[in-house]
């Protein structure tokens, strides 16, 4: 690195992409084992290896950016493009779920009773827990923006306060969603309605958990003075991701909970 004459970061060989791929294989295989054979051993191994991989990979990235100074403006620009492309890929991912929902609901087949929701399905009231969930996520969108502006202005404690509120709202949303699933009068196996409802809202819930984890990492980094007003892409990426999760929920609420009921 002493003879480097360019602004790019030549990453050292790392085992984490390999362990990450292995943990993803174990998790997906474990999920299938859990569904079909009611065994959670493989799933737990996958979750454990995935958690360890995330911790150590994040640790290495923090070392490279904060302590070794490898994240030059050029590198940060590349990371920004990468995050934008990742969010675009997530948009297309959710587009598939919305497509399945509208394909099924706009022209219900005779097997569904020719109506939507299908005969025998009692949908959730969109003005109860789903509306509260919407309020919680919109409030978290406001608080993450407050945290971002506080960081850009160099106000450390308001930033920590706003970030903590955002994390708390994210956890609250997850608990509300879990209670809604527990009390829902239909299951994932109740035809196309149950499938589209639980897959779309379930993947969104997974993204909320991922986003909350991302924000928790940012919270602890801010406690250790890792972010400055002009060098904080880790937090910025987390904020972008959180806003994406917010917008997806608004589409889910309007489509599946409100119009679909």
Swiss-Prot record:
Keywords: Membrane, Mitochondrion, Mitochondrion inner membrane, Translocase, Transmembrane, Transmembrane helix. Belongs to the cytochrome c oxidase subunit 3 family. Its EC number is 7.1.1.9. It is found in: Mitochondrion inner membrane. GO terms for cellular component: mitochondrial inner membrane; respiratory chain complex IV. Component of the cytochrome c oxidase, the last enzyme in the mitochondrial electron transport chain which drives oxidative phosphorylation. The respiratory chain contains 3 multisubunit complexes succinate dehydrogenase (complex II, CII), ubiquinol-cytochrome c oxidoreductase (cytochrome b-c1 complex, complex III, CIII) and cytochrome c oxidase (complex IV, CIV), that cooperate to transfer electrons derived from NADH and succinate to molecular oxygen, creating an electrochemical gradient over the inner membrane that drives transmembrane transport and the ATP synthase. SUPFAM superfamilies: Cytochrome c oxidase subunit III-like (SSF81452). It holds the Pfam family COX3. It is a multi-pass membrane protein. It catalyses: 4 Fe(II)-[cytochrome c] + O2 + 8 H(+)(in) = 4 Fe(III)-[cytochrome c] + 2 H2O + 4 H(+)(out). Component of the cytochrome c oxidase (complex IV, CIV), a multisubunit enzyme composed of 14 subunits. The complex is composed of a catalytic core of 3 subunits MT-CO1, MT-CO2 and MT-CO3, encoded in the mitochondrial DNA, and 11 supernumerary subunits COX4I, COX5A, COX5B, COX6A, COX6B, COX6C, COX7A, COX7B, COX7C, COX8 and NDUFA4, which are encoded in the nuclear genome. Coiled coil: none annotated. PANTHER family: CYTOCHROME C OXIDASE SUBUNIT 3 (PTHR11403:SF7), CYTOCHROME C OXIDASE SUBUNIT III (PTHR11403). The chain crosses the membrane at residues 16-34, 41-66, 73-105, 129-152, 156-183, 191-223, 233-256. GO terms for biological process: mitochondrial electron transport, cytochrome c to oxygen; respiratory chain complex IV assembly. InterPro entries: Cyt_c/ubiquinol_Oxase_su3, Cyt_c_oxase_su3_dom, Cyt_c_oxidase-like_su3, Cyt_c_oxidase_su3-like_sf, Cyt_c_oxidase_su3_a-hlx. Residues 1-15, 67-72, 153-155, 224-232 are mitochondrial matrix. Signal peptide: none annotated. The keyword Ribonucleoprotein does not apply. Residues 35-40, 106-128, 184-190, 257-261 are mitochondrial intermembrane. It comes from the Eukaryota. One of its GO terms (molecular function) is cytochrome-c oxidase activity. It is an enzyme of class 7 (translocase). This is Cytochrome c oxidase subunit 3.
